[in-house]
């Protein structure tokens, strides 16, 4: 009898544990900032592993401060075009608490303000956060990470951004769109895939060689990968009046950065690197860096360095075109290695510095005397088209018929990569030999999804 009773109690306890471990779904039923049915109340009530979904549309306007996520939860929105959470420029939107694992999908986060702190839209506070199909926009602060601050300093933090847009955010110091922080021996990982980082800015005062870095993204000692994405129309620094500032309008990297199948375009700074400023480890493959500029002035003299890239870089199967600097190289100012890459019409010069040629490059000028490897072509027009939709998720420069880049790449190349910048179905080797640059000339596959169109933004509210 005692054994039977003991067994029965054990079964009941087991069932209770199983029931407790089962995830619950809590549905947000109104757009109030607090009270029953609100998102804030749902986040108060959840347990680890629960799901928060929504039966509402419109805007949740925050009036009681940031939304704290202090459980490991899934927040599943109805779509970024359907529901927004607005900080009203009075508070941050989301704060993901330390040690938690969270995911947010299908929401727009807007109007976040961190004040003098970091992360206007989101603070990922030593947590693991995945964002999918979201928009983070019109947020900022006087510190770091206007849109998102991924804090792994003296600890760890991991941020994954998928199929999302980070746009029109501002930070006074660095990381207008995103700041990835691995300072003080920390570990911060940032992964961006199939996403757009555009129209963000970082600006500070006119301190010589300081202030306003990483208009789009700033990576401070962390591990960062960007794949199938666009970083465009970001800005960094100020023109003066005493001394221009700013570095890495698109990206400023002080860690390890790998860029693959992506486009860095039309970013502008006033001192170092319109496109990418590197003071760490930088690898760019199957990508396009185009139309970026560094245009500072000092005492009436040009002062912009490296329109496309400044620093050490390993650059392969890529295209650098039409970048501008008013003082030094429009393309690359720095060192590293370059192979199977097009350098076209970067004003000033395509390269300033000492680069090791891996061979099979084409330069519209003499390449600064660096391109002496096998198959290198200098003072040669690569014959490329404008930056446009040529298929795939990002904009590219197509090779025109008759281009000297066609079938002129490394004859010993074998995949991977299996596809050019546009990804499947655009193979990396067509007609027996790889082309030079990020684009492989081949018939257009009309079924390939076009680059995501940017929704027409609403008028930008005046910050309070």
Task: Name each region found by the language model.
Residues 19-21, 291, 311, 438:
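Intrinsic disorder/low-complexity segments, especially N-terminal tails and targeting/processing regions
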Residues 21-118, 124-127, 132, 137, ...:
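N-terminal, post-signal-peptide segments of secreted/periplasmic proteins
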Residues 126-133, 150-153, 158-168, 174, ...:
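Predominantly extracellular beta-rich ligand-binding scaffolds that present long acidic/polar faces
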Residues 445-463:
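Ser/Thr/Gly/Pro-rich low-complexity, disordered linker/stalk segments of secreted
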């Amino acid at each position: 009898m005692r054994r039977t009773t003991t067994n029965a109690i054990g079964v009941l306890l087991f069932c209770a544990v199983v029931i407790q471990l089962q995830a619950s779904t809590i549905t947000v039923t109104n757009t109030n900032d607090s009270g029953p049915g609100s998102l804030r109340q749902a986040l108060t009530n959840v347990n680890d592993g629960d799901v928060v979904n929504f039966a509402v549309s419109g805007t949740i306007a925050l009036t009681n401060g940031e939304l704290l996520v202090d459980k490991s939860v899934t927040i599943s929105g109805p779509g970024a075009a359907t529901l927004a959470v607005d900080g009203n420029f009075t508070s941050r939107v989301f704060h993901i608490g330390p040690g938690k694992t969270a995911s947010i999908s299908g929401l727009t986060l807007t109007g976040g303000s961190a004040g003098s702190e970091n992360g206007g839209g989101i603070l990922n506070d030593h947590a693991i956060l995945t964002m999918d199909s979201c928009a983070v926009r019109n947020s900022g602060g006087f510190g770091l990470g206007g849109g998102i601050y991924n804090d792994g300093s003296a600890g760890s933090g991991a941020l994954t951004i998928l199929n999302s847009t980070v746009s029109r955010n501002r930070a006074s110091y660095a990381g207008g769109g995103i700041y990835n922080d691995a300072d003080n021996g920390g570990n911060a990982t940032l992964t961006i895939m199939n996403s757009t980082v555009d129209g963000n800015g970082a600006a500070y005062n006119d301190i010589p060689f300081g202030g306003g870095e990483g208009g789009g993204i700033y990576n401070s000692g962390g591990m960062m990968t960007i794949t199938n994405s666009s970083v465009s129309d970001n800005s960094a620094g100020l023109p003066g009046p005493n001394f221009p500032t700013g570095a890495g309008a698109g990206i400023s990297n002080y860690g390890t950065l790998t860029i693959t199948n992506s486009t860095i375009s039309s970013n502008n700074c006033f001192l170092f690197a319109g496109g990418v400023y590197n003071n760490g480890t930088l690898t760019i493959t199957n990508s396009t860096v185009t139309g970026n500029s560094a245009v500072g002035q000092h005492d009436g003299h040009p002062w912009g360095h490296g329109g496309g890239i400044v620093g050490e870089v390993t650059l392969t199967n890529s295209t650098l075109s039409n970048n501008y600097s008013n003082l030094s190289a429009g393309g690359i100012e720095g060192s590293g290695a370059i192979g199977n890459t097009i350098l076209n019409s970067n004003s000033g010069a395509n390269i300033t510095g000492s680069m090791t040629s891996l061979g099979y490059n084409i330069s519209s000028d003499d390449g600064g005397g660096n391109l002496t490897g096998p198959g290198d072509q200098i003072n040669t027009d690569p014959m490329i088209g404008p930056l446009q939709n040529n298929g795939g998720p990002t904009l590219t420069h197509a090779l025109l018929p008759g281009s000297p880049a066609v079938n002129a790449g490394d004859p010993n190349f074998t995949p991977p990569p299996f596809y050019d910048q546009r990804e499947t179905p655009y193979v990396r080797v067509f007609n027996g030999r790889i082309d030079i640059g990020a684009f492989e000339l081949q018939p257009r596959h009309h079924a390939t999804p076009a680059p995501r169109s940017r929704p027409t933004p609403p008028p930008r509210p005046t910050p309070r």
